[in-house]
Amino acid sequence: IIQPHIHKKKLRKIYDTNECLFILKGSMRVDFFNNKKKYITSRVLKKNYIILLLSGGHGFKILKNCQFLEVKQGPYMLEKDKERFNFEKK
């Protein structure tokens, strides 16, 4: 049991954007990179998988008719919060 509660208001400084994805159907590949944009590894996410992305870089490739829910903490300023880079998996 989790006792009923509220979350107290507190001004917070956010230095990173964290995101969580829940795969509703289909599948996707996620490519992982370190903070210097160097490729580390890839994993396939399928229906009902959940992933929490906390640091480093990542990219996605839809493999099979994928639908997913993505949640990020805010405020999120789209292009001001994202640095894109090129990568092609061999």
Regions inferred by a protein language model and the residue ranges of each:
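Short acidic-glycine-tyrosine-enriched beta hairpin
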Residues: 34-55
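Histidine-centered metal-chelating micro-motifs
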Residues: 2-3, 9-10, 48-59, 76
